[in-house]
């Protein structure tokens, strides 16, 4: 894998050989950059392709994501293929004390190319630049692919905590992709 860091943009060339048999090497080019509000249609389209992905009716609406990006303008990221399609994304923000990653995803045919790790590094660097020293995320226990990813890149699964939430707006319904 060849990586070139230019300011805040990563251009990564990856050769990918799929399946258990030899195939013609296929080069997939992509760029990692800060997310903008204009990315929402492509990001939403990506979310809809991810099996088991939970979409919240208010928080994950265009208005909800725009509000999140306004509060956290420099830390969220997308991976964009050479054809302009969004193939990865992370909503990343902080409360002044701890960072949090939301909706970390990579399109299935772009996985295992280093995109996920490069996006996480981008987010962690953005958080460090804002004086944040710790970051967390939530991964569903049934998300085998995601949990394997976090273990592989060295994140610590906390067994000493319980996670609680409370829905303030009952209209903010979560629907899971099938």
Q: What are the roles of these predicted feature ranges?
A:
Residues 137-146, 165:
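Conserved beta-strand-loop-alpha-helix junction that forms the acyl-donor binding cleft
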Residues 127-139:
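Conserved GNAT acetyl-CoA-binding A-motif
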Residues 102-105, 116:
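Mid-chain, well-packed structural core segment of small domains
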Residues 80, 104-111, 139-140:
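A short, internal acetyl-CoA/4′-phosphopantetheine-binding micro-motif in the GNAT/acyltransferase core
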Residues 30, 34-103, 122, 126, ...:
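Acetyl-CoA-dependent GNAT
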Residues 4-6, 10-12, 16-38, 170-178:
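Conserved N-terminal entry element of GNAT/NAT acetyltransferase domains
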Residues 151-160:
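Conserved acetyl-CoA-binding loop of GNAT-fold acetyltransferases
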Residues 112-125, 152:
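Conserved acetyl-CoA-binding loop-helix of GNAT-fold acetyltransferases
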